[in-house]
């Protein structure tokens, strides 16, 4: 099996290493040629995944069209907002018989599209049955060290999902399958926003009660958007739902939770982003999901509060107060 992994950040590198350790022929694409050269020479990603050695079967490239033509499986591990631009480079390359495994989590700004929708919109030769979303609670820092992790491979095509399951599955990286790609993608996108809210709670010095409320009511928001867009609410009880939500809201590895914590401490978004070496997808997703929720008529008060704090400079303490002072209602509304 020949596999191309697009995106040499921490997660793309981790998955490329995982697959190469299974002795597949893997090529990792880096956007900048000088970065690709450094990775190939140093045999590790010192910028994003320091200390993890590359297996001999993993090679680094910077040319995309030839790589896509060569690969049987394409893993897209670029930031969500860069997915369209990245795949546009192979719009004219035949993709028949190939599987595209997307691991980017987010909603596209401007269009409100999920990642599978972006792929199909930009690649007319691609069928939805060829697309698999690989999501779940899976920090690169732990997977790269072969710590136990479970994820879900989701596609309308059970055959495609099972192929990806077999491809990635190890005794330390357990892969389940699921056919509800809508629910999986919505959950994977919105959980980053809720993690920012959880971090804000930490930054303000609130306790476990507040964190539990944010996670629980955040899950309710995800459920409302999921069902509105055609997903199955039952998916949210799985790895891509509550599993990924909990780990992202609680973990010290979570970049989104970190952004929220710094906001809660009074730093500006510009200051926080400038100090980070990697992207927190929830920042862009908060704007995209807020706009999408208004478009489709779904009430998402936590998402709205995060949007207001990030993009309208609303004080964090005031945003929390406004959430708490909303009209009383049924828990199931």
UniProtKB/Swiss-Prot annotation:
**Residue positions of the active site:** 191 (proton acceptor)
Entry-linked PROSITE patterns? NAD_G3PDH
Enzyme Commission number(s): 1.1.1.94
EC top class, as a word: oxidoreductase
Q: What does this protein do?
A: Catalyzes the reduction of the glycolytic intermediate dihydroxyacetone phosphate (DHAP) to sn-glycerol 3-phosphate (G3P), the key precursor for phospholipid synthesis.
Q: Which family does it belong to?
A: Belongs to the NAD-dependent glycerol-3-phosphate dehydrogenase family.
What name appears for this protein in its UniProt entry? Answer: Glycerol-3-phosphate dehydrogenase [NAD(P)+]
